[in-house]
Regions:
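Structural and coupling elements of P-loop NTPases
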Residues: 1-535
Length: 535
């Protein structure tokens, strides 16, 4: 086996998704703890502690103890090289979250055992389903009072239309949580909460048929309940089907407590066995094999000012095939020119390390002087590969934004453009209007606060914001259509994006139906795929 093949085969690249406060950042840190990337798990809640989660790097994240941007983390575990794309899980994430999922080969969905599925989970699941990637479910916080596990599985199957396969089964919850039954090994992993999550823990294994030892560990009542539930789940759950898992049709479910390190190691072991090395990607209708020697990659994220000491702009690239080598000339397809990547970096949140090589499945960050856009393709010189564009997802909240100080016009324009290119916001203009006032669209309303905070702290510019009553947006797909000829209601507005594409923003679904009925030939789309042309 060649070095290229062996390196790519051991890569695993996945995203962690979750609703607010489900324990996603804690789970991420425990993965790093098991992989030896960190020595102890930091406090996720930044308000009460001077420790912050490794994956939270922006000032506002540390102040609030939440993840607003998507972090990229890499660590080694049991011979595998694991790339984690840690996405925002707070109540108002951004389009950056959706785009990050386009760079992952699988997703780990974290669910709070007390709350079940929440609105953000539904949105993120749709993106995963659109890509047909494996989805693993980690039901967290079993050490607290939780919903019935059968109800949680029913909700998952009903909401998402997929089958589930519990890999383990919880023994109680809250103060009565005693551990998990491993259906694969037919053994019990006993929970001991004495460690409280700061160190690696190892449970006490016990066969489910060992009545005497089970009674000693969990008591006769919980033993009887466990045996009954395991018999029920063995008879009622879907069969284990690895191919169905790898195509996102069957979700393996794990129960545990990330805070206490319980269930982390079994999850990692099963996850690594069930997932595959990097998946092929489609470029102009053809599949690009990750094991191909020719290097290819695409830009899925751009982040400015990650580190105030650097004050720069980083383009994050997902390597799709071959091997990247530092100092070698590559070709930027959309820019139609060759360039050299002399300072490629891998990230641990805002910490950077210059690397000499990277392989398919890896995420690298490169300095961007302003030449890259999200969705751009990078490949070998002499090749002209072009990956499918990354969809632009519809924002749900809108505001009119303008600078307070007219003397800060340049800073305002620069900051707005850079933050928009990162994918946190989308910018729209009313035709024939100036650039002093723009309409900003976001997926979650917290991004308005993030925009104001960053423009002030990074660009020295104060904003005046007026929230608008629009909640829906659609791209006009009719080529050559003059929007002035459309019959529009008073609660619908015609705007353009920075590429000059025409869109309509609406106050409600009803307004969309009204416009479609009055304009029967009008074609509208919920999202736009980037279609950048070569210079």
């Amino acid at each position: 086996m060649s070095e290229l093949t062996s390196q790519i085969e051991r890569r695993r690249t996945f995203a962690i998704i979750s609703p607010p406060d489900a324990g996603k950042t804690t789970l991420t840190e425990k993965f790093l703890l098991y992989g030896g990337a960190i020595q102890s798990a930091g406090s996720v809640k930044g308000k009460q502690s001077d420790k912050h989660a490794v994956s939270d790097w922006m000032d506002i994240e540390k102040q609030r103890g939440i993840s607003i941007t998507s972090s990229v983390l890499q660590f080694e575990y049991d011979g595998y090289c694991i790339n984690i794309l840690d996405t925002p899980g707070h109540q108002d994430f951004s389009e950056d979250t959706y785009r990050t999922l386009m760079a992952a080969d699988s997703a780990v969905m974290v669910i709070d055992a007390a709350k079940g599925i929440e609105p953000q989970t539904r949105k993120l699941f749709k993106v995963c389903a659109m890509r047909d990637i494996p989805i693993f479910t980690f039901i967290n916080k079993l050490d607290r009072e939780a919903r019935d596990p059968f109800d949680l599985l029913d909700e998952l199957e009903r909401e998402f239309g997929i089958n589930t396969y519990p890999m383990n089964w919880p023994i109680g919850c809250g103060q009565k949580f005693r551990g998990d039954y491993d259906r694969d090994k037919r053994q019990i992993l006993f929970f001991d909460n004495a460690h409280r999550g700061r160190e690696l823990i190892h449970g006490v294994e016990c066969e489910i048929t060992d009545t005497e030892k089970l009674d000693e560990l969990i008591g006769p009542y919980q033993r009887e309940e466990l045996v009954e539930q395991v018999e029920l789940i063995d008879g009622a759950s879907a069969d284990f089907d690895l191919e169905a898992i790898r195509h996102g049709k069957l979700s393996p479910v794990f129960f545990g407590s990330a805070l206490n390190n319980f269930g982390i190691e079994p999850f990692l072991e099963h996850f690594l066995k069930m997932t595959t090395s990097p998946l092929p990607r489609v470029a102009e209708g053809k599949e690009i094999n990750p094991f191909d020697e020719n290097f290819t990659a695409f830009v899925f994220k751009i982040q400015a000012n990650m580190n105030k000491a650097h004050r720069d702009r980083i383009a994050f690239m997902r390597i799709c095939s071959g091997k990247f080598e530092r100092g070698k000339d590559y070709y930027h397809v959309q820019g139609n020119k060759a360039f050299r990547l002399s300072q490629p970096q891998q990230m641990m949140a805002d910490e950077r390390a210059v690397i000499d090589e990277a392989y398919a499945g890896d995420i690298i960050g490169v300095f961007d002087p302003g030449i890259f856009s999200i969705g751009d393709t990078i490949c070998e010189k002499g090749e002209k590969v072009r990956f499918e564009g990354i969809p632009t997802f519809a924002p749900e909240h809108f505001a009119m934004v303008e600078q307070v100080d007219s003397m800060k016009r340049k800073q305002f324009a620069k900051g707005m453009n850079q933050i928009a290119q990162e994918g946190a916001i989308q910018i729209f203009f009313e035709p024939n209007s100036g650039l002093e006032r723009v309409i900003v669209g976001v997926v979650g309303v917290l991004q308005f606060e993030v925009l104001e905070h960053r423009l002030k702290s990074e660009y020295g510019c104060d904003l005046r914001r007026t929230n608008l009553g629009y909640s829906q947006i659609r791209w006009i797909e009719n080529e050559g259509l003059d929007p002035k000829t459309l019959k529009l209601s008073h609660d619908t507005k015609w705007v353009q994006d920075f590429r000059g594409k025409n869109l309509l923003i609406f106050t409600s679904e009803w307004a969309i139906r009204w416009v479609m009925e009055d304009n029967p030939n009008l074609k509208l789309a919920e999202f736009s795929r980037d279609e950048q042309k070569e210079d």
